[in-house]
Every structure is written in structure tokens, then in C-alpha cells.
């Protein structure tokens, strides 16, 4: 004689109650063969529900052994027990335990999702089962739109979704009227006739009459185990015939789960054991789409989630916007610095700024400018010497800074012209009495609208013709109020200042040449020419680097503030997910009962948290672009600059926020005991 399908040997189940343990099952020995229809009868508190939970691998014995098809369940881990529930057991609960937020088809598909069944296959099977149970026209109704009998039939169909070799029915008619109860009993008979093993747990002896075998339990002990002499009579009462069986429940055992060989319908013959849990390949992980989408639809705290998402939105908007503002400010500052001549190196007499001997050093001469201009790393070089002198035009007298410069000065400094042209090399050689003035000088001498080009002005009583006016410069460092006039340095030396030496030399380094290396080379050249180092250099590249470092530091500081808001949003995600786990405890129990593994539950809640954060991140990035558009309207000088790196970083941050702050709630959900979870309201 072959071994029974389900076998309990000396099973005891205790539960802690304060300092003592309460014995719910005591030394239970029970064997159930494949294809049997068995009723476990007992009063409330007799231990029958605990026995059913152990039979369905929802609970485990404190002592003794429970084998399914010869396999000791004590030796199985949580995933293997989930595989047993998923592929070989189907549960029919008194309270139906259907997910209220999805329709009948989606409720049926749930076990098949965890079994890894393709979407088209599970959808077709769900509709087929509903049709065979008379619910074809209720396929897209939610549980709240179905009667009690219809909900119980959906529960039965769900139990059959993956084959349902063993159907465990806990008070299947307890919440139904007489007619609906008879319909459920008839369906169970039909399933048994097709080879399903049926275990009915009930306190109602009228329901127990429909089993071939009645097992009575009292105070955790089996007090009777006898065949039912009235089975044929009860069988006839519900009107189960061959035609009805074929019409209503044919092929209900054809399940997607592999290794599920149907046992013979003859329950007097011992059945083949159920396939071992490792006989079938492990079900693939639930797709993130189903894990997150189904879960997000089930959340009853939509408003709370929106508020939680608001924290993520604010955090991501802050991070992206601050980075964009910082990048825009940095570029604007560099452009402003560029307007005064970037990539330039200036040489001054003396050892450093404030050198008291600098006025006595007269070694910087025009020949040095010519030597520097010939170097391969130099784009241009210009001398400079300056004094504050009196300017006069007609009856207007003003003091201005008069600078004697070379013809390449304006190129070296990156200056642009509003009117006229700069002087050329010929003017420098001829000591031409020409001048270039800035906008401030123009306004003082000629007014804001008059064109001064071609007019003669007196520079310290030396007449000079204005040939150009530089463009006005609006600097990030403030508007320039000084008056400036530029004349050829030969004119300044010979006609105005009476000196042959230079105050400074400015060198523009060629593009692509390292500024630091160029600085060292020109220092070496000048030391060779002068025989000693009687000058010092000022590299504008150091200013650029300082501005860049300052901008980066400021951006980092502001980003840290934004990250704090992102962390606050992440804590909000964790809080709402913890609340969600508490509110959806029964749903978690249902999912575990139909075969969800701990990793499936963990993934579901983790994906939900990530989806919330990703959605918040997407909205935050969109808001950042909107703020950028508004910013450009109200701040015309510079714009927020969005980079792909900042956007990618924002998405990564939102994803990591979901993973980090969603992990603990997801782990708590995955570690719930299915029995405790199902017992929650």
C-alpha cells in the first residue's frame, strides 16, 4: 500500500501565552490519501483551524512530523514551503480573502503570477475557470460588486488556478445562505470526482455529511475518525451528476505548474505521492511591473502617498535646481572674467604686490614685449604704462586713467568696440596722437548720445583724436565707474609721461597651451634677459580656478541642504510604507497563502517605494525645468544650466532613496507570519 498524500505523526502545536504555552494540538496522528474528501469537525477552539493551517503549510508543528508526498515539511525552507502552497494546495476561506481593489480575473491570476505563468496563459485560464464556475459575466467585477456565493466561487477558482491538488476549505459555507452553500458543496463534490483531494474544516455536521470520511477533533485531539455512512445520500442531495461534473469543472486540474500528476479519482486506492517541492523549477521572480503596479493600486492611503511624494519632489527639485543655478552662475562668472582677459599672464616690477622698491625698478622695457611676443606659446603681448591725467573737451574737464598700451592690448584683454576702431601698429610706431575712450569717459565729455569718433580732446594739454569707443561692460563684480583712456604706449612715453620703461606687460597665452607651463617659461626667459628676477607674475588662470572652486564649494553646500530635504522625504517614504504594511497585512497573508515567497513580498514593497520615489523624482525634474524657464524671465543676465549628469544623478538619488528607505518596511512585510497576517482585519 502506497504512502498517504498527507500524513501527520504525533503532531503537537503550542503557542506562547505569557509564562506558559497553550497546547492547541496534542499528539495528532492523521493520514489523508490522494483523492479523498475529508471533513474535520469540531467546535470553536477545538484546534481544527490550526490543523488546517499545518496541512496547508501555513503553520508548522511544534513537535512531530508532517509529510506531503513523503517529504518532511520540517526540512523545507520558507521558499520551498511557498512552492508547495503555490503548486499543490488551494485555499477556500470562510471570509473569501479576495483583494478588494482588483477584479475577479486579477484575483485569480495572483497564484499564477507567483508561479511565473505567462500573462496570456494565466489570463486565459482565469477566464476559463470563471466560466466553468458560472462567473463569466462577472470576470471584471470587484469583490464588493459580487454576492457572497459569487465571492466564494471566485475563491474556489483561485484555489484551482495552479492545479489545486489539495483543496483546503475552511468553513466554506459559513458566511453563505442555504442556496449558495449548496452550490459551493456541489462544486467541491465535482472537484473531488475529478481527483482533487478535498479537506473541509467545519463545525457544522450538516456540511460534514458531504465528506466520505469525518474526523472529529476536540481540545486539540482527534476523538473520532470514521467513514461517513450517509455520504451517498448527501451526494445525491446536491445533485452532482456526470453531466454536471463535465460541464462545470472539467480540466480544472490542468495547471501551469509542472510536476503535478493528477491522482486517481478512486479514493479507496492509495495515491501517488505529491511531487517533491524541488521537482519543479523555482518560479521566476515576480516582474517589477506586477509587484509595484498591483501594490500601488492597493494602497488606501493615496493622499498620504501624495504628501510623501511631495517630500521627494521638493528634494529632487532642490538638488537639480541648485546644481543648475550653480553651473549657470559659474559659467556667467567665467564669462565675466573672460571679458577682462582670461588665459593672460601679467608681469610687474618688484617681488610682489606692495613691494616698496617697485617704483625704483625700471627694467621692464618695450624690447621685453617684442621678445615675449616671439615665443611659441604666446598669442600676443602688450606693454602698459599709466597715469591719472586731466582731460578736456571744450569747457568740460575730468580726470581719467590714461594708459599707454600696444596695438594688441584690446585683443589681449578681450575688449569689444561700440564705436570706431582700435589703433594699429603703425600708430604705435608713429607716436600717433590718437585715443580710445571708454563709455564713462564718453558720457562725461560728450554725453550719452553724441558720437565722439573724430573729435579732438586734450590729454594733459596734448591734443588727441578719438578713434574708438569700447563697449560698456556690466560686470558681476559691480559696474565700473572709472574713466579710462588708451593711447599708443609710444605716445604716452614720448609725449605724456616722459618715461622709457613700462609699468607692466600682459601676455596672452595661446589656446591649448597650459597656462602654468607658459608662466614658468616666460619667467625663465625674463630672468635670462634681466640677469635676475626683478619682477613677479600674476596669472589670471588662478582667478578662474578660484572662481571655479568657490562655485563648486557653494554648489556643494547648497546641495547638502537639498540632500537633507531629500532625506526627510525618504523618511516620509519609510513612514508611509510602514503604515502601508500595517494596513495591508491581510493582503500580505493572502499573497503568502497562494504561494508568494518572502522575496516576492520584499520585492513588491521595495518596488512600490522605488516607484513612489521615481515618480516624485520625475515630477521634481519637470518642476526644475519650469523654474529654469521662470528664472530666465526674471533674471536676464544669466540662466540656469541643466546638465545630463545632474538629471541622471537626480534619478539615481530618487531610486536609492526608495531602496534605502523602503527596505525596512519591505523586509518587515516579507517576514510576516501568514497565519497572523490572515487573522488581521
UniProtKB/Swiss-Prot annotation:
Biased composition (Pro residues): 274-285
Location of the ABC transporter domain: 6-244
TM segment ranges: 306-326, 554-574, 611-631, 644-664
Region annotation (Disordered) ranges: 246-298
Keyword Thylakoid: no
Predominant subcellular localization, coarse grouping: membrane
Biased composition (Low complexity): 246-273
GO BP annotations listed: response to antibiotic
Pfam family, one: ABC_tran
GO cellular component, one term: plasma membrane
EC numbers: 7.6.2.-
CDD domains given in the database record: ABC_MJ0796_LolCDE_FtsE
Keywords: Antibiotic resistance, ATP-binding, Cell inner membrane, Cell membrane, Membrane, Nucleotide-binding, Translocase, Transmembrane, Transmembrane helix, Transport
SMART domains recorded: AAA
Bilayer disposition of the protein: Multi-pass membrane protein
GO molecular function: ATP binding; ATP hydrolysis activity; transmembrane transporter activity
Location within or outside the cell: Cell inner membrane
Bridged cysteine pairs (disulfide): none
Binding site residues for ATP: 42-49
PROSITE patterns hit by this protein: ABC_TRANSPORTER_1 (PS00211), ABC_TRANSPORTER_2 (PS50893), MACB (PS51267)
Quaternary organization: Homodimer.
Function: Non-canonical ABC transporter that contains transmembrane domains (TMD), which form a pore in the inner membrane, and an ATP-binding domain (NBD), which is responsible for energy generation. Confers resistance against macrolides.
PANTHER family with a match to the protein in the record: MACROLIDE EXPORT ATP-BINDING_PERMEASE PROTEIN MACB, MEMBRANE COMPONENT OF TRANSPORTER-RELATED
Family: Belongs to the ABC transporter superfamily. Macrolide exporter (TC 3.A.1.122) family.
UniProt name for this protein: Macrolide export ATP-binding/permease protein MacB
Organism of origin: Burkholderia orbicola (strain AU 1054)
Gene that this polypeptide is encoded by: macB
Amino acid at each position: 500500500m502506497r504512502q498517504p498524500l498527507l500524513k501527520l505523526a504525533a503532531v503537537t502545536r503550542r503557542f506562547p501565552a505569557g509564562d506558559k504555552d497553550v497546547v492547541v494540538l496534542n499528539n495528532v496522528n492523521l493520514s489523508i490519501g490522494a483523492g479523498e474528501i475529508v471533513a474535520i469537525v469540531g467546535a470553536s477552539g477545538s484546534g481544527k483551524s490550526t490543523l488546517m493551517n499545518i496541512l496547508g503549510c501555513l503553520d508548522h508543528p511544534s513537535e512531530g512530523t508532517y509529510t506531503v508526498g513523503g517529504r518532511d515539511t520540517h526540512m523545507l525552507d520558507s521558499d520551498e514551503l511557498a512552492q508547495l502552497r503555490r503548486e499543490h494546495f488551494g485555499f477556500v476561506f470562510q471570509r473569501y480573502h479576495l483583494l478588494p481593489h482588483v477584479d475577479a480575473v486579477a484575483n485569480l491570476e495572483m497564484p499564477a503570477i507567483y508561479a511565473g505563468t505567462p500573462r496570456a496563459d494565466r489570463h486565459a485560464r482565469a477566464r476559463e475557470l470563471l466560466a466553468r464556475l458560472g462567473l463569466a459575466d462577472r470576470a471584471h467585477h470587484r469583490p464588493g460588486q459580487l454576492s457572497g456565493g459569487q465571492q466564494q466561487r471566485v475563491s474556489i477558482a483561485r484555489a484551482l488556478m495552479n492545479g489545486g491538488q489539495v483543496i483546503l476549505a475552511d468553513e466554506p459555507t459559513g458566511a453563505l445562505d442555504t442556496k449558495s452553500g449548496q452550490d459551493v458543496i456541489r462544486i467541491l463534490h465535482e472537484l473531488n470526482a475529478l481527483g482533487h483531494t478535498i479537506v473541509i474544516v467545519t463545525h457544522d455536521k450538516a456540511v460534514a455529511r458531504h465528506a466520505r470520511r469525518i474526523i472529529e477533533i476536540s481540545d486539540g485531539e482527534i476523538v473520532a475518525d470514521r467513514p461517513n455512512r450517509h455520504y451517498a445520500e448527501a451526494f445525491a442531495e446536491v445533485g452532482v451528476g456526470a453531466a454536471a461534473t463535465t460541464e462545470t469543472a472539467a480540466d480544472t486540474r490542468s495547471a501551469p505548474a509542472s510536476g503535478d500528476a493528477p491522482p486517481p479519482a478512486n479514493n479507496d486506492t492509495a495515491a501517488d505521492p505529491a511531487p517533491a517541492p524541488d521537482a519543479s523549477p523555482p518560479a521566476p521572480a515576480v516582474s517589477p511591473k506586477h509587484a509595484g503596479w498591483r501594490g500601488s493600486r492597493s494602497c488606501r492611503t493615496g493622499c498620504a502617498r501624495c504628501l510623501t511624494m511631495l517630500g521627494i519632489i521638493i528634494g529632487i527639485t532642490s538638488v537639480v535646481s541648485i546644481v543648475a543655478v550653480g553651473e549657470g552662475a559659474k559659467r556667467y562668472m567665467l564669462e565675466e572674467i573672460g571679458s577682462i582677459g582670461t588665459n593672460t599672464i601679467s608681469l610687474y616690477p618688484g617681488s610682489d604686490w606692495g613691494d616698496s622698491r617697485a617704483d625704483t625698478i625700471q627694467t621692464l622695457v618695450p624690447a621685453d614685449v617684442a621678445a615675449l611676443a616671439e615665443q611659441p606659446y604666446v598669442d600676443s603681448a602688450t606693454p602698459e604704462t599709466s597715469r591719472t591725467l586731466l582731460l578736456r573737451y571744450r569747457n568740460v574737464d575730468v580726470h581719467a586713467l590714461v594708459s599707454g598700451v600696444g596695438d594688441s592690448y584690446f585683443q589681449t584683454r578681450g575688449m569689444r568696440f561700440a564705436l570706431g576702431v582700435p589703433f594699429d601698429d603703425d600708430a604705435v610706431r608713429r607716436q600717433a596722437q590718437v585715443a580710445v575712450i571708454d563709455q564713462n569717459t564718453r558720457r562725461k565729455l560728450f554725453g550719452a548720445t553724441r558720437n565722439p569718433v573724430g573729435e579732438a580732446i586734450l590729454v594733459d594739454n596734448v591734443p588727441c583724436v578719438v578713434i574708438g569707443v569700447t563697449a560698456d561692460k556690466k560686470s558681476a563684480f559691480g559696474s565700473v565707474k572709472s574713466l579710462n583712456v588708451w593711447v599708443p604706449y609710444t605716445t604716452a612715453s614720448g609725449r605724456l609721461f616722459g618715461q622709457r620703461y613700462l609699468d607692466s606687460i600682459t601676455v596672452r597665452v595661446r589656446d591649448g597651451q597650459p597656462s602654468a607651463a607658459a608662466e614658468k617659461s616666460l619667467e625663465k626667459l625674463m630672468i635670462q634677459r634681466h640677469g635676475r628676477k626683478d619682477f613677479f607674475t600674476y596669472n589670471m588662470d588662478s582667478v578662474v580656478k578660484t572662481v571655479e572652486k568657490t562655485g563648486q564649494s557653494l554648489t556643494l553646500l547648497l546641495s547638502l541642504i537639498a540632500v537633507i530635504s531629500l532625506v526627510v522625504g525618504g523618511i516620509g517614504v519609510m513612514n508611509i510604507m510602514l503604515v502601508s504594511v500595517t494596513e495591508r497585512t491581510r493582503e500580505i497573508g493572502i499573497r503568502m497563502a497562494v504561494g508568494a515567497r518572502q522575496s516576492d513580498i520584499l520585492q513588491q514593497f521595495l518596488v512600490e517605494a522605488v516607484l513612489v520615489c521615481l515618480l516624485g523624482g520625475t515630477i521634481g525634474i519637470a518642476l526644475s525645468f519650469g523654474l529654469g524657464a521662470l528664472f530666465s524671465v526674471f533674471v536676464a543676465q544669466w540662466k540656469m544650466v541643466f546638465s545630463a549628469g545632474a538629471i541622471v544623478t537626480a534619478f539615481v538619488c530618487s531610486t536609492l532613496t526608495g531602496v534605502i528607505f523602503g527596505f525596512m518596511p519591505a523586509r518587515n512585510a516579507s517576514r510576516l507570519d501568514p497565519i497572523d497576517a490572515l487573522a488581521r482585519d
